[in-house]
Amino acid sequence: MKALVLHGKHQIQIEHDFPEPPLGPDCVKIAVSYCGLCGTDIHKYEGKGGSRPVVYPVPLGHEASGIVVETGKQVRDLKAGDRVAVDPNWYCKSCWFCQNGLTHFCENSRGVVKGFAEYICPPRENVYKLPDSLSLRDAALAEPLSCCLHGMDLLDLKTGQTVVIIGLGSIGSIFLQLCRRAGAARCIVVEPQEQKRGLGMRLGASLCLN
């Protein structure tokens, strides 16, 4: 399959014969339609590891949406042609952390889906069927949106409060919109790039500072 593959720091190329991921009995083969570019991808490109070392060669990308091509033998509730979004994180489900609801600390994580490729094969439990009203393009933002929604839960924003958002990348942009919808009286953005400050004002920021 075709994939955008990272071979090392600043060593990235499009390959046309990268091996397709195997389809396990509880997995779903998806033809990727859209995949977002995350800050984590940039860090890997720059040779910086995240929570785990980067093992080369590896396709980047994990904020993916697409169309089901095939399902494993144990999957009964999805079929070819279904439009889906993906939770990119694969957990072992057996370590102490997974058993106690702390999957983000999984000791045996299989990593994340590799969305800058033609196909991915995540477990069924990581695949979410999309409503007809949601485009595949927008659905690629499901993973960063879920991160922001968790942040909103932790923030416990009250109507009428003022919020300061530092940085207006994709996460900051989503937070700005969520805070406005949650009833923040003022949303102040701190962002060094003029173009992004303009975006902040268009998204409803009360004030954008350099």
What label would you give each PLM region?
Residues 90-166:
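NAD(P)H dinucleotide-binding glycine-rich loop of Rossmann-like/cofactor-binding domains
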Residues 10-15, 39-40:
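Short N-terminal binding/cap micro-motifs at the start of the first secondary-structure element
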Residues 20-35, 49-96, 131-134:
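Glycine-rich beta-strand-centered segment in the early N-terminal region that forms part
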